């Protein structure tokens, strides 16, 4: 009976190990899957922001247009990295956790098998004890019962040893998997953030180098140029500006000419619309 009690204690430890693993791995899988989905949603929102930035840039003056397009390009590049992050999380973190359910199920089946063998051993022992109490003189029946007990005990011992090896292997693999899964998780996050910081630094420099004064000059020239379009050109007008003409208006006229030239060049450069790239298309290159 002491052996049986020892086996019962051993089985409880094994069952607790598997139960705790099942609960914890299930929660890890659920939480990390939610983490990955939210990362994917963040990527989608950033894609929308990129599109909105490009749409807005197309309505602005040349300096702001170029700045916002470059900024949007950097932001889109970060989303390519984020897409790679999502795919790697699914492959190296979520899928291994999902597969753990199969291992837990197999280990539980081994424990159930052992408990069935152990119960048979207990049943044979109880049968032997009853025979000894009721028919102590029936040596043949008692001998047969003792043989059955011995056979059940050997079977239980063998199954117990097999189960011990199974659970030991399960525990060892569980610890290694926890280490690897979360090491992969941290590595994936570090790679993404390192690349993102690099691109965001470029985006910051792009915004910092924006020339506000050029756009203001262009904008003011446009405002003054609106009225100039409605003025009839006088015949044989002296090209020399009249001294009586206000200095600010003269400067405005010169600025208008410069801005019109800039606009012509800018319109040629932007004749072909830059489509928003499919951000998902670059993810495969990032995984290489």
UniProtKB/Swiss-Prot annotation:
Single GO BP term: cilium assembly
Main location: cytoplasm
Residue numbers spanned by region BAR-like: 6-217
Cellular-component GO terms for this entry: centriole; ciliary basal body; ciliary transition zone; cytoplasm
Residue ranges, annotated region (Disordered): 133-157, 256-288
Hydrolase recorded as keyword: no
Biased composition (Polar residues): 138-157
Record-linked Gene3D superfamilies: Arfaptin homology (AH) domain/BAR domain
Compositionally biased region (Acidic residues): 266-276
Keywords recorded for this protein, A-Z: Cell projection, Cilium biogenesis/degradation, Cytoplasm, Cytoskeleton
Cellular localisation: Cytoplasm, Cytoskeleton, Microtubule organizing center, Centrosome, Centriole; Cytoplasm, Cytoskeleton, Cilium basal body
Keyword Ribonucleoprotein included in the entry's annotation: no
Domain of life: Eukaryota
InterPro entries xrefs: AH/BAR_dom_sf, BAR_CBAR1/2, CBAR/FAM92
A Pfam family annotated for this UniProt entry: FAM92
Free-text note regarding domains: The BAR-like domain displays limited similarity to other BAR domains.
Record-stated family: Belongs to the CIBAR family.
Protein purpose: May play a role in ciliogenesis. In cooperation with CBY1 may facilitate ciliogenesis likely by the recruitment and fusion of endosomal vesicles at distal appendages during early stages of ciliogenesis.
Subunit structure: Homodimer (via BAR-like domain). Heterodimer (via BAR-like domain) with FAM92A. Interacts with CBY1.
Protein name stated in the entry: CBY1-interacting BAR domain-containing protein 2
Organism from which the protein derives: Bos taurus
